[in-house]
Amino acid sequence: MTDLVTFQGRKAREQVAFAKVKREFERHGYLVAPLALNRSETFAEAERLLCIANDPPLLFMVMCLPDGVAFHPEKQIGYLFEVKAPKPNRSTVSIRLRDLMALTLWQALIVVVTDSEIKAAFAKDLPTPECIIVPDEPPTAWDYGALEWTKQVYPDAKVLEDIAVEFGSRAPYAVWSLEAFASLDFYL
């Protein structure tokens, strides 16, 4: 059984989810390649520096590069896409706010792989999240910027502050119902 809690377990789930997404794109005639699927490993040293940088817009965009790229040669349609693999039996998906901001700038498709289906939505088209969660640890400068940006984009979102987070990133994130996403086939 895949470890659902540790960093390595989450990354293993993402690898499996990416393979499913790749097969689905390829089934529709797309060419697919990973872009920044393993960025946590390849950018580990840079990420540490970016978290303390005052104004890192260019590096921020590189650090939050989407997981993959898909291109349909006949239709001349391409997508940058980010794969999310929520825990089994979940009806929600969470996205770090700094990732959401960058994925919106990249005009990326967020692809969510559940136990039974593959869903997707453009980052820029997501509705107001169910909530924004701000962990009890102080945000980095870029996480604070992403939090302020998200509050402007979604002024009606409920913000829960000082929340203890046991596992995963301590960066602020937003939570959406899976109902906010359409079938991936809609985009293909």
What are these regions (language model features)?
Residues M1-V5, G9, V16, R27, ...:
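Non-catalytic C-terminal interaction segments of nucleic acid-processing enzymes
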Residues M1-V5, R10-K11, P34-K75:
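Active-site metal-binding core of divalent-cation-utilizing nuclease and nuclease-like domains
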Residues R13-V21, D99:
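Conserved alpha-helical elements of sugar-nucleotide-dependent glycosyltransferases
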Residues R23-E24, A102:
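Alpha-helical scaffold elements within enzyme catalytic domains, especially in hydrolases
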Residues F25, P66-N89:
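Conserved catalytic cores of phosphodiester-cleaving nucleases, focusing on short active-site segments
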Residues A33-A36, L80-E82, I110-T114:
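A structural signal for short, well-ordered beta-strand segments and their strand-loop junctions
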Residues T42-F43, N89-R90, I118-F122:
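Short catalytic/ligand-binding loop motif for oxyanion handling, primarily in non-cytosolic enzymes
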Residues P86-Q107:
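Mg2+/Mn2+-dependent nuclease catalytic core
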